[in-house]
Amino acid sequence: MKIVYIYHSFILKGGIERVFCDKMNYLAQNTSYDVTFITFEQGNHPFAYKLNDRIKVVDINCRFAELWNYNIIKRNILNFILRRKLKKCLTATLKKESPDIVISTTEDIKYNYCIFNLPYRFIVESHVHMKEIIKSSIKKQFFIHSISKIFFKWKLSKINKCKLLVALTDADKRDWSKVINSDIIIIPNILTFYPDKITDYSKRSKRILCVGRLTKQKGFDLMIKVWAKIADKHKDWKVDIYGDGDLRDTLNELINNYGLNDSITLHSSTSNIYNEHMDSSIFAFSSRFEGFGLVLIEAMSCGVPCISFDCPHGPSEIITNGKNGLLVQNGNIDEFANSLDSMINNYEQRKFMSINARIDSQKYKRENIMPQWIELFETLSKTMRI
């Protein structure tokens, strides 16, 4: 069987990139499938995550990100040209590869919609919850509201042409079922690595770990405000934030304004994040919204109790409140601060949640999730082409 994954690039380190890479690597290492990865903005950039040597990589030279270097008129002209090129090249590449199944994401629909009329079995993965896609697609400004609304409906029509949509959470499945007619199933993200041994919880540093891109979505500005409310009570505790992104200067300024330079540190992203988990006592998740929350299960696999905003979607389906972590009302900084304060003060509660977090994260291990994908592929391969 030949499986083709399509994604714009693996230049940046992120959850989608990590999961796509892990799934392709698993299939290449553990099945007889031929796996091909098609990108269109990778160019000569190194891959953020290492791909198995059995995976065939094809890059189609369509650099949409570079269009922002031009004025709006030239940008739109070049955008039209690039989209025609992408359609032609994707069509030719798929014809050459002749895949049994093609997999893409809801985020890339705006680019690769042009191939959904081709006679292949298409699967679309939803890595950003549906309501956020609506919010980002339909602008508030009156003069472009109608146009963006039409664009969103057009986008849904393209998703409807796919054989199947795979959601990461039950909540996201319910949301998608209201707006598309395609079949929808749930397969959660896989846990990249489940350590055989972890550091004894009693020997860990008094630090709170946060991980993610430095963007508004990840809510690190909220986390800084949370810590500002209780930092004076816990002078022997530190907050370490790992990630890269455009908001680094803004977040550093916020840290400075609150006088938290001695207790909050922004670090660049690291390829050894599990080492950081092993030396952390709490994992704080401050996202405004998520598709799943991969970093939560990574922390839990290392026995780190988590505290999270109950944002849409993911945390409430991963964290059982009071058992393996704590959930607080989405965006409620005071409640988050109070819950974090209580968590810090109650070592026995943290140790109890640490044990349960490690146990509960096992269901996301590759050997438990990937058979669901293989079963799906085998089932679809027995159906007639669209």
Map each language-model feature to its residues.
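Aromatic "clamp/platform" in nucleotide-sugar-dependent glycosyltransferases that forms part
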Residues: 269, 288
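N-terminal strand-loop element at the rim of the active site
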Residues: 5-13, 26, 30-77, 175-177, ...
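A conserved mid-protein helix/loop that constitutes part of the nucleotide-sugar donor-binding site
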Residues: 14-22, 206-229, 246-253, 334
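Membrane-proximal helix-turn-helix segments that form the acceptor-binding/catalytic region
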Residues: 88-92, 145-165, 179
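A short, well-ordered alpha-helix in the C-terminal region of glycosyltransferases
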Residues: 256, 263, 276, 335, ...
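Conserved acidic donor-binding segment of nucleotide-sugar-dependent glycosyltransferases
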Residues: 320-322, 326-333, 341-347, 362
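Short hydrophobic beta-strand element within catalytic cores of glycosyltransferases
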Residues: 305-309
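Carbohydrate-associated surface elements
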Residues: 171, 190
